[in-house]
Amino acid sequence: MESAVSTSTQVPDEFDRNVPRICGVCGDKATGFHFNAMTCEGCKGFFRRSMKRKASFTCPFNGSCTITKDNRRHCQACRLKRCLDIGMMKEFILTDEEVQRKKELIQRRKDEEAHREAQKPRLSDEQRNIIDTLVDAHHKTYDDSYSDFSRFRPPVREGPVTRSASRAASLHSLSDASSDSFSHSPESGDRKMNLSNLLMMYQEQGLSSSPDSKEEDGSSLSMLPHLADLVSYSIQKVIGFAKMIPGFRELTAEDQIALLKSSAIEVIMLRSNQSFSLEDMSWSCGGPEFKYCVNDVTKAGHTLELLEPLVKFQVGLKKLNLHEEEHVLLMAICLLSPDRPGVQDHVRVEALQDKVSEVLQAYIRAHHPGGRLLYAKMIQKLADLRSLNEEHSKQYRSLSFQPEHSMQLTPLVLEVFGGQVT
């Protein structure tokens, strides 16, 4: 009985691709190189048996039979002669002992591979479900076509150049990794809705649409109306995302609001990394009209004290090359921080955050062999976000104290950022 162990000769891929897969003995479909020649399984077995038995065949005709797939059994002498003519060599045939050793080697490799596979870190069903839920929540609350941006008050890039704007171009030379970003998640919202109403809406109905924003005349901060609408819209989407985090709805309304008020700008900054480009240090949200550079943000009242670390953060986060699963888990961890001002049930919030953190660590172990530092780098990004949040709050307060500017902000922005405690 023929051995099931292959004794085929391995040949380079380039040669394999250029050689027709036809048996050189009988013209049947070849299965590879066997004993130094391209043959079918039938002729491979015939040659092995003939050599092992040291068979001696005699042609009943004139010794020049044409061997084909249909007649290859009619003349063994000419078939064997054809095998030798195309280069098949008995030296390539394994002895019974060699065949047994090869079988054992193949089995040992299979066992080792099975053991490695069994030892590989795996996610539990519960952890996989948490990831799937968060990815789905992100997809439902982040429209990467940015189609709703046209509903905001239009961007106006003309106007007086501020000191920050004149220095903003220098940020385009940044290429190293470090701290944070500016906000611009997907979709628009009712500027008359407050945070409590939005929480109730998402609690009862889930995701909702968002009406058009009114166009108003701008002030010297020409981009403020547009970016105020963008941030208001992004806050609504963060609320929608938060409501789908496993366990978030079970928190008290007070704790939900406290978490959202304190973390909204940080989650927006995290989400905005999806549209951030390392090539020109800008956020591209669709067409040219909705491509934002640092100079645009200075025209909404922010200074380089926020924007420089913001861009460094975006660069650093982008260079981590996070999987989408890691990105959404990081957003959930950010949102579920028990040390936020106003949170009452710290233990419950911390338990939710710990569970998501464990999922992130398990995912990294399963998908980044040797990437032990990745989790620490991601958590450092959350620390960077705290600093950015603090600077954003300081600059927001300065802006909101000026009536001509605060009137450009939406009620939701005023509520979320107006009551922050730092």
UniProtKB/Swiss-Prot annotation:
Ranges annotated as DNA-binding: 20-95
ZnF (NR C4-type) ranges: 23-43, 59-78
Tissue: Detected in embryo 24 to 48 hours after fertilization, and in intestinal bulb.
Domain of life: Eukaryota
Localization annotation: Nucleus; Cytoplasm
Name of a matching Pfam family: Hormone_recep
The keyword Transcription appears for this protein: yes
GO-annotated biological processes: cell differentiation; embryonic cranial skeleton morphogenesis; heart jogging; heart looping; inner ear receptor cell development; intracellular receptor signaling pathway; negative regulation of transcription by RNA polymerase II; otic vesicle development
Span list, region Interaction with coactivator LXXLL motif: 243-261
Spans annotated as Disordered: 106-128, 145-190
InterPro entries: DBD_VDR (IPR042153), NHR-like_dom_sf (IPR035500), Nucl_hrmn_rcpt_lig-bd (IPR000536), Nuclear_hormone_rcpt_NR1 (IPR050234), Nuclear_hrmn_rcpt (IPR001723), VitD_rcpt (IPR000324), Znf_hrmn_rcpt (IPR001628), Znf_NHR/GATA (IPR013088)
9aaTAD, short sequence motif: residues: 411-419
Single annotated GO MF: RNA polymerase II cis-regulatory region sequence-specific DNA binding
Region (Hinge): 96-125
Record domain NR LBD: where: 126-418
Binding site for Zn(2+) 2: 59, 65, 75, 78
Residues that bind Zn(2+) 1: 23, 26, 40, 43
Major site of localization recorded for this protein: nucleus
Compositionally biased tracts (Low complexity): 163-185
Function: Nuclear receptor for calcitriol, the active form of vitamin D3 which mediates the action of this vitamin on cells. Enters the nucleus upon vitamin D3 binding where it forms heterodimers with the retinoid X receptor/RXR. The VDR-RXR heterodimers bind to specific response elements on DNA and activate the transcription of vitamin D3-responsive target genes. Recruited to promoters via its interaction with BAZ1B/WSTF which mediates the interaction with acetylated histones, an essential step for VDR-promoter association. Plays a central role in calcium homeostasis.
Subunit structure: Homodimer in the absence of bound vitamin D3. Heterodimer with RXRA after vitamin D3 binding. Interacts with ncoa1 and possibly other coactivators, leading to a strong increase of transcription of target genes.
Record's comment describing the protein's domains: Composed of three domains: a modulating N-terminal domain, a DNA-binding domain and a C-terminal ligand-binding domain.
Protein name: Vitamin D3 receptor B
Species whose genome carries this gene: Danio rerio
Gene (name only): vdrb
